[in-house]
Amino acid sequence: MYNLSKKNKKLLIIFLVVFISISSLSLISTEYYFMSPGPPYQWDIEYESIDNYEFEGNLYQLTVRRDEANALIYAWSYVSNSVDLYPREVILPKGVSPEELSQISIQNMKTSENVAIAVALKYLGYDITSKGEGVSVVGILDDSPVKDALKRGDLLNSINNDEISSVSEFIAMLRTYDIGDTVKIGLIRDVDGSLKNLEIQTKLIEHVEYEGEPMVGFLATTANERFDFPFEIDIKTGNVGGPSAGLMMALNVYNNLIPNDITNSLVIAGTGTIEIDGSVGPVGGVKQKVIAAKRAGAELILVPTANFEEAKPMETDSTNIVAIDSFEEALKVISEYSSR
């Protein structure tokens, strides 16, 4: 039988105390969500009935890991520059379960995928049509000015009498207004089995994640959105959710459908939502995404203009961070950078 020395016994006791303490912290829940760098993705895309081309470089989509923070992660966030905390109600509206939030995120990714494909094909000269049946309310933030006026299941169809048929159109229209503006929202609500046309008025507030960006304050999906594509394109997104991959999905599709590789074998990474008009919008977790890009060896990082001030200080001699507002501008930046 092996006998421990007094010194080794003390070390063993210290180790056990630390191990038990850390294990205990991991079992304690908090009222926060955390965000940390996720893996960069180079999308696997399948095409049917159309010539496509592989490319030598990388067009990485940047991701974050977002989940409920236990006490261990909560403590770790105070010593790590790559982990941020958010109050639970900012991420998870009242009445929405984590499982529902995950499904909403996956659905938003699917919508983003279709919009990205549409943007890339339009730029290549294809005539693309899309149509949804309105903006479906799936959750309402506690601090939203419409928390008593909107209900889950409401179907929004206009802003100030201008029709909207999708979340993409809704966001694009909101960006034509300023924070503090009052807007009139038209909607359809199921009242005791009967559909009623209603209107509400609300002031736009600042987005909880994107500084300077107006919002109403609810989670949404597009009801029955349909795209008419000339051929089938399937982006293998797996379990990645959210709308922030739009820009990079559009760039990947575009680069696969032209014979000349826009990357020129460079490692390029980026993030940004994309709307049907090609405009690029802000994202959350840009700090974590830039960290992930640098870890992947990215030479050029594309970020939405709205996120540029946060991202710019992280630039190094070997990594250039560039602000972009549109798909077309992203192509121009990549072309200029890859031709150096």
Model features per residue range: what roles?
Residues L121, V146, G153-L156, N160, ...:
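Terminal peptide-recognition signature
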Residues L124, I171-F218, P313-E329, V333-S339:
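PDZ-domain C-terminal substructure recognizer with occasional recognition of PDZ-binding tails
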Residues N256, I268, I276-I301:
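Glycine- and Gly-Pro-enriched alpha-helical subdomains that act as flexible
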Residues Y53-Q103:
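Extracytoplasmic/periplasmic/luminal assembly and interaction segments
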Residues E100-T111, D142, N157-N160, I233-P243, ...:
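Second-shell loop/turn segments in exported
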Residues K10-S29:
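Hydrophobic membrane-insertion alpha-helices, especially the h-region
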Residues T111, I117-S158, D162-V167, S279-G284, ...:
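PDZ/PDZ-like domain segments forming the peptide/carboxylate-binding groove
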Residues D190-N252:
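C-terminal, low-ordered peptide segments at domain boundaries
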